[in-house]
Amino acid sequence: MVLESLSSSLRETIRKITGSTYIDKNTVKEISKDLQRILLKADVNVQTVLNITKEMERRALEEKPPVGMAHQDYMVKIIYEELLKILGEPSNVELKPQTIMLVGLYGHGKTTSAGKLSRFFMKKGLSAGLIAADVHRYAAYEQLQQIAESVNAKFYGDPKEKDPVKIIKNGLEVLKDAQVKIIDTSGRDSLDSDLIEEIRRIKEAVKPDQVLMVIDATMGQQAGPESKAINDAVGVTGIIITKMDGTAKGGGALSAVAKMRVPIYFIGTGEHMDDMEIFDPKKFLSRLLGLGDLETLFETVKEANITEEEAQKSFEKLMTGKFNLKDMYDVWEKFSRPGLMKKLVDSLPLAKLPGSQKINDDQILTAEQKLQRYRIIMDSMTFQELENPEIINAKRITRIARGAGVREEDVRMLLKEFKAMKNNMKLMKGNRGFKKILQSNFRSGNFGLDDLGLK
């Protein structure tokens, strides 16, 4: 998950608050110290951290929660609102024909981001073309060409031409049928006069609709000064922060860049070409705190091609204990695409579930591998066995294991976990709070933020 360490610590703090018998001055002080430690570890500026926690303490001790809201939930609401202040305003990514120019230093992920951007717009129904205008970095042309092929985007480049302006103008003509044209420009090891002059010359000649600066999240707070320097020199319309999944400093990078008052358009959340998302401060913070991001959850379900009717049917079967192996197989098959399960888990309101634990990337990978093995096992079952797992005896287990090329123990483990899941659902059936969460996920999409008064 993006900012896994930060998220895990913040979710633990949320659980500490919601698990408190009451909120008094000592509790507020303790939570304040926890937040300071967590945010400083994430490389957020010291003064920013002090300002956040000071205001959080003041509000927690002076303000009274609305009628019907518990002090614990109101405390979470205050933390949410104070953290939201340092993440900037929502971006306005327009889904229309446009020309986008990417700028930034070497190694920050411009070329990969160009591919992810093209993939993003193509998923939204717009055709995309990539233009290789990095004339300095070795193999930049070949890398972007390979990326374009991997996402089925159009491509233009001229490895023999050393004038980026000529390349781009020719590229815009060749790719005139592409609705979104993305220009990958050269970088430098540091911001120098040559880089600034080249970017200015391209911008003046091409007049792109958007100039997006690509920043590496591993820079932490230092992302702020660098972003400001490039923005002051050439003027940018938005920012892409990359590698948010691989650093503990992402929180510092986000808060530092947000101070520029230039919107953060996208964040890179993984290695796959699908791992780029529009940066929405409210959605991002909700996921970070474990309050859920139901909009992303439903987008993920949509990506898996699960209809609302199918989701509702699965929910009803789960809650009535009628869920069988065939139903389980159908769901797993839809979420088998790489990265989709991770995206789903990150969107769930786990901090609201009593006794829930943080699910890390290694656990998700292990689960994906296990589910793949279980799908192979179920492929060796008859329709009757999938519909009625109770009939699977020792003889059938032996046959299924041989057909799937696995151990009999693996088949037994699948049946054991399926039975445990059904039993857990029966227990949860009487838990109205848990049922409310599940129903919200399948139906309304309003749980989490609405329940805390955050929307």
From Swiss-Prot:
Its EC number is 3.6.5.4. One of its GO terms (molecular function) is 7S RNA binding. InterPro entries: P-loop_NTPase (IPR027417), Signal_recog_part_SRP54_M_sf (IPR036891), Signal_recog_particl_SRP54_hlx (IPR013822), Signal_recog_particle_SRP54_M (IPR004125), SRP/SRP_N (IPR036225), SRP54 (IPR022941), SRP54_GTPase_dom (IPR000897), SRP54_N_sf (IPR042101). GTP binds at residues 104-111, 184-188, 242-245. The keyword Cytoplasm applies. The keyword RNA-binding applies. Part of the signal recognition particle protein translocation system, which is composed of SRP and FtsY. Archaeal SRP consists of a 7S RNA molecule of 300 nucleotides and two protein subunits: SRP54 and SRP19. Involved in targeting and insertion of nascent membrane proteins into the cytoplasmic membrane. Binds to the hydrophobic signal sequence of the ribosome-nascent chain (RNC) as it emerges from the ribosomes. The SRP-RNC complex is then targeted to the cytoplasmic membrane where it interacts with the SRP receptor FtsY. HAMAP family: SRP54. Belongs to the GTP-binding SRP family. SRP54 subfamily. This is Signal recognition particle 54 kDa protein. It comes from Thermoplasma volcanium (strain ATCC 51530 / DSM 4299 / JCM 9571 / NBRC 15438 / GSS1).
